[in-house]
From Swiss-Prot:
Domain text: The zinc-finger domains are required for binding to dsRNA, and also for nuclear localization.
Gene3D superfamilies according to UniProt: Classic Zinc Finger
Reported effect, residue 152 to A: No loss of dsRNA binding capacity. Loss of 40-60% dsRNA binding. Binding capacity was reduced to 5-10%. Loss of binding capacity
Any one Gene Ontology cellular component term annotated for this protein: nucleus
Superkingdom of the organism of origin: Eukaryota
Residues reported to bind Zn(2+) 1: 75, 78, 91, 97
Tissue: Expressed in all tissues tested, including heart, brain, spleen, lung, liver, muscle, kidney and testis. Exogenous expression induced apoptosis.
Residues the record lists as binding Zn(2+) 2: 136, 139, 152, 158
Protein's recorded name: Zinc finger protein 346
The species this protein was found in: Mus musculus
Keyword Zinc: yes
Length: 294
């Protein structure tokens, strides 16, 4: 469709796109000579799905990717003539243009894109099956047909390679377990791994490990060594009291809490005397079960 240049009376104000002479082209109709294929739908969707173009470079990039619809002098979607550089920039950055492009895409492009998305999902599922019928990554073999592939997967060669791979995986897991038991490679207290003994020694002399050791000794002193939450809690994450369901931020806070009246009256517990270290069972006094941090 050829669109005449605007008359002097039709020229737009600065910053506005000049309209075609006459009414705008109906939105449901594609511009003449434009075939709306999948690739064009994708490019146009990318152009309007994000933020509006800001600045000359983004506008030029949008025009370059969608030359079938946008040029420096004409917007076929809005049926507008752009008679100056300022009008071109103002038009392509306007909300009115963006809204018309979205409506245009909804009419001509969304069905195309939706169809592509559905096909992509089914294609991905079928491609895995096709890949399996084309090659075996375990045995590093390729097949000329699905029948040859099926014969391979049922054969002794594939079964042997699969068994070796499984054994290798198990061996790697056992090696990892052995490394976790080696203090020069893994610290079970801090859940840290080391590449060499020097790195391990540096860790064991560091503040983080010492803090975890102090935490563990403190819990043991107050009869909390059997609490799994203590050893599972990462270093630097506080000092938990499962009885009161709170976490203290420092050793001093924890000591003050477990020595306090509120903690002692939550449930029966063991008090350790400083002289004999003999545990003595005490019974709680009647108290509200609500938990309040000291």
């Amino acid at each position: 469709m050829e669109c005449p240049a605007p008359d002097a009376t039709d020229a737009a104000d600065p910053g506005e796109a000049g309209p075609y002479k006459g009414s705008e082209e109906p939105e449901g109709r594609e511009p003449d000579g434009v075939r709306f294929d999948r690739e064009r739908a994708r490019r146009l969707w990318e152009a309007v799905s994000g933020a509006q173009p800001a600045g000359r470079e983004e506008v030029e990039h949008m025009i370059q990717k969608n030359q079938c619809l946008f040029t420096s002098t004409q917007c076929k979607v809005c049926c507008a003539m752009l008679i100056s550089e300022s009008q071109k920039l103002a038009h392509y950055q306007s909300k009115k243009h963006a809204n018309k492009v979205k409506r245009y895409l909804a009419i001509h492009g969304m069905e195309t894109i939706k169809g592509d998305v559905k096909r992509l999902d089914s294609d991905q599922k079928s491609s895995r099956s096709k890949d399996k019928n084309h090659c075996c990554p375990i045995c590093n073999m390729t097949f000329s047909s699905p029948a040859v592939a099926q014969s391979h997967y049922l054969g002794k060669t594939h079964a042997k390679s699969l068994k070796l791979k499984q054994q290798s995986t198990k061996g790697a897991a056992l090696q990892q377990n052995r490394e976790m038991l080696d203090p020069d490679k893994f610290c079970s207290l801090c859940h840290s791994t080391f590449n060499d003994p020097a790195m391990a020694q540096q860790h064991y002399m560091g503040k983080r490990h010492r803090k975890q050791e102090t935490k563990l000794k403190l819990m043991a002193h107050y009869g909390r060594l059997a609490d799994p939450a203590v050893s599972d809690l990462p270093a630097g994450k506080g000092y938990p009291c499962k009885t009161c369901k709170i976490v203290l931020n420092s050793i001093e806070q924890y000591q003050a809490h477990v020595s306090g009246f509120k903690h002692k009256n939550q449930s029966p517990k063991t008090l350790v005397t400083l002289g004999s270290q003999t545990p003595v069972q005490t019974q709680p006094t009647p108290k509200d079960s609500s938990t309040v941090q000291d």
